[in-house]
Amino acid sequence: MTTEQARGQQGPNLAIGRQKPPAGVVTPKSDAEEPPLTRKRSKKERGLRGSRKRTGSSGEQTGPEAPGSSNNPPSTGEGPAGAPPASPGPASSRQSHRHRPDSLHDAAQRTYGPLLNRVFGKDRELGPEELDELQAAFEEFDTDRDGYISHRELGDCMRTLGYMPTEMELLEVSQHIKMRMGGRVDFEEFVELIGPKLREETAHMLGVRELRIAFREFDRDRDGRITVAELREAVPALLGEPLAGPELDEMLREVDLNGDGTVDFDEFVMMLSRH
C-alpha cells in the first residue's frame, strides 16, 4: 500500500475525531481532563486554620470558648477577685483596748498621785510666797483699802495671778459672792475661793522649786538620777504599799529617753506632765 493510500484510510477517522459536537449536545469530560474544583478560603477561615496549627500540638481548643472555661479565676472562697478573707477590723481591736485596763497609766497615778497632790493638788497648803502673791493681788484691787473687793473686780484680780477664768466660771463665782458674801469678799474668803483654782492653773509656773523637792524625794543618793531601785524604795513611803516591779520598769522605759536605765530631772518633769 502506498503512502497516499494509507493517508486516505486515516483521513476520515481523524476528521471524525476532530469534529465538533452538534449544538446543544454536551460531551462529558474525563477526570483527567477536568481540573479539581477549589474554593477560595476567606480570611477568617485562614486565620482559624493557622490558629489550629499553632495550638494543635498542645491540644488546646481555639475559637469559641471551651465548655466551662471563663476569664474569671475559679472561686476560692476568699472574697471578690481572690482577696484574702477579711481580717478582724479595727473595731474589734478598739474593743479589746477599751476593755483592757491601762496598767501603765494606773500605775503612774498610784505612784505619783499622792505626791502630786501634796506638791500641786488642791489639798496642799499654800506656801508663804504664794500667800504673799495673793495678798499683793488682793491689795491691788482693794482701791479704797477697806479690806474688801467686789465681785466685779474678782475677774481682773484672778487674771493678774495668771488664772484665766471662763465667762461661765466668773458668772458662777460672782453669783456665789453676791448670794452668800454680800457681793464682796475679804482676803481670807478670797484665798478660800481662789486658792484651789489658782493651784491647778499655775502649778507649772510656781512648781519648779516643788518639782526639785519631789525629785530629791526619789533621788536618795543625790546623784541627780532616779533608778528603779530608788523608785521601789520611795513608792512604799508614798503609797503605803509596794508597786509591782514590772510596772515600775515599764514606766521607767517610757521616759528613759537616753536609754541609760535611769531618769534625770528633765525626764522626771516629762513623766509628771504625762501622768
UniProtKB/Swiss-Prot annotation:
Region (Disordered): 1-112
Tissue specificity comment: Expressed in retina and in the inner hair cells (IHC) of the cochlea.
Domain EF-hand: 129-164, 183-200, 206-241, 243-275
Any one cellular-component term (Gene Ontology): cytoplasm
Keyword Disulfide bond: no
One Pfam family named in its UniProt record: EF-hand_1
Chain positions recorded as Ca(2+) 3 binding sites: D256, N258, D260, T262, E267
Molecular function terms, GO-annotated: calcium channel regulator activity; calcium ion binding; transmembrane transporter binding
Subcellular location: Cytoplasm; Presynapse
Comp. bias regions, Polar residues: 1-12
Binding site for Ca(2+) 2: D219, D221, D223, R225, E230
Modification after translation: Phosphorylated. Phosphorylation levels change with the light conditions and regulate the activity.
CDD domains: EFh
InterPro entries membership: CaBP1/2/4/5, EF-hand-dom_pair, EF_Hand_1_Ca_BS, EF_hand_dom
Function: Involved in normal synaptic function through regulation of Ca(2+) influx and neurotransmitter release in photoreceptor synaptic terminals and in auditory transmission. Modulator of CACNA1D and CACNA1F, suppressing the calcium-dependent inactivation and shifting the activation range to more hyperpolarized voltages.
Protein name, per record: Calcium-binding protein 4
Originating organism: Homo sapiens
Lineage: Eukaryota, Metazoa, Chordata, Craniata, Vertebrata
